[in-house]
Curated annotation (Swiss-Prot):
<dbReference type="InterPro" id="IPR037176">
    <property type="entry name" value="Osmotin/thaumatin-like_sf"/>
</dbReference>
<feature type="disulfide bond">
    <location>
        <begin position="33"/>
        <end position="226"/>
    </location>
</feature>
<keyword id="KW-0325">Glycoprotein</keyword>
<feature type="disulfide bond">
    <location>
        <begin position="74"/>
        <end position="84"/>
    </location>
</feature>
<dbReference type="GO" id="GO:1904550">
    <property type="term" value="P:response to arachidonate"/>
</dbReference>
<keyword id="KW-0611">Plant defense</keyword>
<feature type="glycosylation site" description="N-linked (GlcNAc...) asparagine">
    <location>
        <position position="90"/>
    </location>
</feature>
<keyword id="KW-0020">Allergen</keyword>
<feature type="disulfide bond">
    <location>
        <begin position="148"/>
        <end position="198"/>
    </location>
</feature>
<keyword id="KW-0346">Stress response</keyword>
<feature type="disulfide bond">
    <location>
        <begin position="89"/>
        <end position="95"/>
    </location>
</feature>
<comment type="similarity">
    <text>Belongs to the thaumatin family.</text>
</comment>
<feature type="signal peptide">
    <location>
        <begin position="1"/>
        <end position="19"/>
    </location>
</feature>
<keyword id="KW-0732">Signal</keyword>
<feature type="glycosylation site" description="N-linked (GlcNAc...) asparagine">
    <location>
        <position position="186"/>
    </location>
</feature>
<dbReference type="InterPro" id="IPR001938">
    <property type="entry name" value="Thaumatin"/>
</dbReference>
<comment type="function">
    <text>May be involved in disease resistance.</text>
</comment>
Amino acid sequence: GSIPFWIALIASFSVFLQGVKVKAPTFEITNKCPYTVWAAAFPGGGKQLAQGQSWSVQPDAGTSTGRIWGRTDCSFDGSGRGTCQSGDCNGTLNCQGDASAPVTLVEYTHNPSMNLDFYDISLLDGFNLPLSITPTSTNPNCKGIITCLSDINSQCPNELKVSGGCLSACVKYNTDDHCCRGANCNQTLYSRFFKEQCPQAYSYAKDDVTSAFTCPSGTDYKIVFCGKSDHIFALYLYITINNEE
């Protein structure tokens, strides 16, 4: 699939970063789904999570971009080789590459030169499970509890349905319009479907206004599969954001 416009833009600035490598954010990933999820991070690897289990991912210092997601219905042998019905990453438990569609993605760009983290939930490769991301910061400039908790799989248009999830139209049809290739692109009927289900998530590549979120550098994050974070900061941020609207 395509990538959000802001990631391409911010990543271009990262080329110019020089000097000391800065600590990347830590991500605490928790599975609240009533089934096992094989969490994945690139960079970061992978881990099997039963319901209620967590995994802390700390990318190497200097890491500028990454993706985190959940895999479903996986089977791995003792060497960590196998397959997943959704979110598979080259048949390995310890991910060393991107996910196979359909998959619900958390994407981040860490840019210390701007003193900002950029993060989002992307449905550009489709949807396989609900999730949320919550920054663990009380900084008022850190606005962005993002959720995509709709049961998209049960609502998925028949032509996009596959085992384990719901494909995006870009992955399914690979056309310029659906994949937002070229100088200008607009919503399609399919991207509107995803946006209606998850208003805070990317539904097409230039969906930046309502889908790109920032926090000051130094912020860590909680990602929850099938639920919201119950962290105290979630309530604080919700109150802060709504009081300022």
